[in-house]
From Swiss-Prot:
This is Stearoyl-CoA desaturase 5. Detected in brain. May self-associate and form homodimers. Belongs to the fatty acid desaturase type 1 family. Expected to bind 2 Fe(2+) ions per subunit. Keywords: Endoplasmic reticulum, Fatty acid biosynthesis, Fatty acid metabolism, Iron, Lipid biosynthesis, Lipid metabolism, Membrane, Metal-binding, Oxidoreductase, Transmembrane, Transmembrane helix. The histidine box domains are involved in binding the catalytic metal ions. Residues 24-44 are annotated as: Disordered. InterPro entries: Acyl-CoA_DS, FA_desaturase_dom, FADS-1_CS. One of its GO terms (biological process) is unsaturated fatty acid biosynthetic process. It is found in: Endoplasmic reticulum membrane.
Amino acid sequence: MPGPAVDAEKVPFRSAKEEIRAGVGVEGSEGGGGGGGRERPGARGHRQDIVWRNVFLMSLLHLAAVYSLVLIPKAQPLTLLWAYFCFLLTALGVTAGAHRLWSHRSYKAKLPLRIFLAAANSMAFQNDIFEWSRDHRVHHKYSETDADPHNARRGFFFSHIGWLFVRKHRDVIEKGRKLDVTDLLADPVVRFQRKYYKITVVLMCFVVPTLVPWYIWGESLWNSYFLASILRYTISLNVTWLVNSVAHMYGNRPYDKHISPRQNPLVTLGAIGEGFHNYHHTFPFDYSASEFGLNFNPTTWFIDFMCWLGLATDRKRATKQMIEARKARTGDGSA
């Protein structure tokens, strides 16, 4: 069973706007009492240089993924199943690992599980755990401001992929430096992955997915590389990005109508349980990232299974009373 809910007033990484409504002044937030200036949506006052290397590499990756589609009929069924299995591992490295464990500390994981999730996270190749988690904490605390790495108020393209095509806004860097990330640096698994990130990415994201089909059931290296590595990697990237873009623009807001994140079932389907985004931004400490627990939430299934095995503990959960009170106070009435 899920662990007891934590006190909402003690939950870390609340958004700046949420702290405003709770009467807590936040430097640089909208209307905050900390004396900071108003955070403006967008980056009109700050030029962000285009990172042409990223533009080129991402364009090349997506072109290669399109080419990969023509190889699907030529590949062995086991290769396609392997590619999907690698996609699930990749997703768990982000959702159960970098997101719910390391960014939000919504549950605790023992060393074997942390090692597994770190390996899966390297397969995801979306920055190392430390950087991913730090930026995600900034995203929650300063959502929809210039300090948000993928500020949805700058449009669909920017929040989906465009934010990777430019250098980080100075506010993202500044706010990130002010966050307390000592818990991340205290984890030897996080430190190891960060130190050897390039090596682990090459092995987990490209070498292992490619060699397994070739070595075990005789798939061609060409098919293995493009399907289990390139296509799988490209799809997993876009699924994660959909949470930043689609789930911040399309859907209802039953828990807090004053924030951008929405409930989006299609994103939930692709991102194995991460599409209950209005709930997640309202109750970021909840390990399930959803009011509905096991209602198509594979990441929650995985964490619960790890708890059953004794590899995870201390799952945090919002109480029913807390959820209903929040719906009545700030929800849009859709649920």
